[in-house]
Amino acid sequence: MSKKYLVAYMTLGYPNVNDFYKFIDNIEDFGVDILEIGIPPKYAKYDGPVIRKTYKIVSNNIKNYYEILYEVKQRIKIPVVILTYLEEYVDKLGDFLLKLKESRVDGVLFPDLLIDYVDEYEKYVNLIKNEGIKTVLFTAPLMPDDLIIKASKLTDLFLYYGVRPTTGVVIPISIDSLINRIRTMVQSKLVVGFGLNSIEDIKKAMSVGADGIAVGTSLIEEVDKNGVNGALELIKKLRGVLDEY
């Protein structure tokens, strides 16, 4: 039985640089397999209010994102995936990818790629791969089956499957039926996120074939309520749940 992936998200430099580094320095020991770092865009159309708030705080306080990214890669060994919007960089994608490469990050995830740029997505995937950066593709239940299947063959580290329209927003869904459907279509590593709101949700996802979970909103809420230590304790708890499968 292979280990289930725990993918942890944190907005770059949140809540401040020192606490962000404290979070980074401890996540491997607490069981995180892949780190997602959010770079604030001007318009975060697919993020919920909790993550949008962090973007506003960080964009007001931090100017050089790439220095921090480089430092992150000096501190941890697990893969680092940047999450931001293609819309923000579509006219300067080459420069952006070069800066990511110089920062030594491993991959990039554009949640808007297969939604707003679906007619050109293969071109952008090739540009990313040609820079030696891994592509993580985001899919969702309303996407056509053939697009999801194609994305599963192009994605590198894992296929991200968002079960709700935005992060941290509770909409009644049948998680097990959604994952059952996509599991029959794809052979790639399947990580489920974008709206897992409870341990019960996570257990449902694991029991029907998900290879891991991505958690972000709840980590930020823990940081806000209980500091970095609270977020690390949540990671420890989630690792324990995943290890049951």
Swiss-Prot record:
Top-level EC class as recorded in UniProt: lyase
Keyword terms: Amino-acid biosynthesis, Aromatic amino acid biosynthesis, Lyase, Tryptophan biosynthesis
HAMAP family: Trp_synth_alpha
Family per similarity comment: Belongs to the TrpA family.
Its job: The alpha subunit is responsible for the aldol cleavage of indoleglycerol phosphate to indole and glyceraldehyde 3-phosphate.
GO MF, one example: tryptophan synthase activity
Domain of life of the native organism: Archaea
Oligomeric and partner information: Tetramer of two alpha and two beta chains.
Classification via NCBIfam families: PRK13125.1 (NF009621), trpA (TIGR00262)
Active site residues according to the UniProt entry: 36, 47
UniProt cross-references to SUPFAM superfamilies, sorted A to Z: Ribulose-phoshate binding barrel
PANTHER family: TRYPTOPHAN SYNTHASE ALPHA CHAIN, CHLOROPLASTIC, TRYPTOPHAN SYNTHASE, ALPHA CHAIN
Pfam families: Trp_syntA
InterPro entries: Aldolase_TIM, RibuloseP-bd_barrel, Trp_synthase_alpha_AS, Trp_synthase_suA
Name recorded for this polypeptide: Tryptophan synthase alpha chain
Pathway: Amino-acid biosynthesis; L-tryptophan biosynthesis; L-tryptophan from chorismate: step 5/5
Enzyme Commission number(s) of this protein: 4.2.1.20
Swiss-Prot/TrEMBL catalytic activity: (1S,2R)-1-C-(indol-3-yl)glycerol 3-phosphate + L-serine = D-glyceraldehyde 3-phosphate + L-tryptophan + H2O
Cellular component GO terms, alphabetical: cytosol
Residues making up the signal peptide according to the UniProt record: none
